[in-house]
């Protein structure tokens, strides 16, 4: 999770204001911290290996998968569960993105979130979760697992530019993609699909387009 439970934080503040600090839920801190998403999965399935959470906003799930890939690659584990979840449709979540002017103001459902369109004006908030099982290749083959895909490269970089805007030249994101391709030993022309961030905001889509062009030529 990138933000933990905003709802728990809201409920805690409301309880402080209406009934005093002594009436706050004693579990409010575990509910708020981001690593509880991974912790609850660990408890549910009895997984007792490495259990961490990366909190990097919209890149959280991808970075968690990348870290799980590295854990297997380094020999720390044979199997890892990795993914992300977010549930931030609540007053503070909506208000925060509204103040950022990141949410679409369109009343037309077909035009409310239109990434890379010249008339884009923001995104529509959603909630969801997704988890993948990563497994060392020989371990998966030996037990007859149904292998759906193989992770062969991973790149992660920082723009060191601004707290809400990507680097204007797309250099940071481009280098992450180039690093992943180098590790995978694939050429740009071999890539058939790019899963873009595509927030439908003016700056993100513009700078992300530049990043893709830099990485793929």
Task: State what each model feature region is.
Residues 3-21, 71-74, 94-107, 168-169, ...:
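A glycine- and small-aliphatic-rich helix-loop capping segment at beta-alpha/alpha-beta transitions
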Residues 64, 176-184, 211, 215:
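Stable alpha-helical structural segments in soluble proteins, enriched in small hydrophobic residues
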Residues 26, 30-34, 38, 61-65, ...:
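Generic structural signal for well-ordered, non-membrane alpha-helical segments
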Residues 34-86, 124-145:
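Active-site-proximal alpha-helical scaffold in enzymes
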Residues 78-121, 154-168, 196-205:
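Acyl-CoA/ACP chain-elongation machinery
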Residues 41, 61, 68, 97, ...:
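Conserved small-residue
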Residues 1-56, 85-94, 188-206:
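Conserved beta-ketoacyl condensing-enzyme motif
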Residues 108-186, 190-193:
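Condensing-enzyme catalytic core mediating Claisen C-C bond formation in acyl metabolism
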């Amino acid at each position: 999770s990138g933000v933990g439970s905003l709802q728990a934080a809201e409920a805690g503040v409301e309880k402080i204001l209406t009934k005093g600090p002594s009436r706050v839920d004693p579990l409010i801190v575990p509910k708020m911290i981001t690593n509880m998403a991974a912790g609850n999965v660990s408890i549910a399935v009895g997984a007792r290996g490495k259990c961490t959470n990366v909190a990097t906003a919209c890149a959280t799930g991808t970075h968690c998968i990348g870290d799980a890939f590295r854990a297997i690659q380094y020999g720390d584990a044979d199997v890892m569960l990795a993914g992300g979840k977010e549930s931030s449709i609540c007053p503070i979540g909506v208000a925060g993105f509204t103040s950022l002017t990141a949410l679409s103001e369109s009343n037309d459902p077909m035009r409310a979130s239109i990434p890379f369109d010249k008339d884009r004006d923001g995104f529509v908030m959603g909630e969801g979760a997704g988890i993948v099982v990563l497994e060392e290749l020989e371990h998966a083959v030996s037990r007859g697992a149904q292998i759906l895909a193989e992770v062969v490269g991973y790149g992660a970089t920082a723009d060191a530019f601004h707290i809400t805007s990507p680097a204007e030249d797309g250099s940071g994101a481009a280098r992450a993609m180039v690093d992943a391709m180098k590790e995978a030993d694939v050429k740009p022309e071999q890539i058939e699909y790019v899963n873009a961030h595509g927030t439908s905001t003016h700056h993100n889509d513009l700078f992300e387009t530049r990043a893709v062009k830099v990485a793929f030529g």
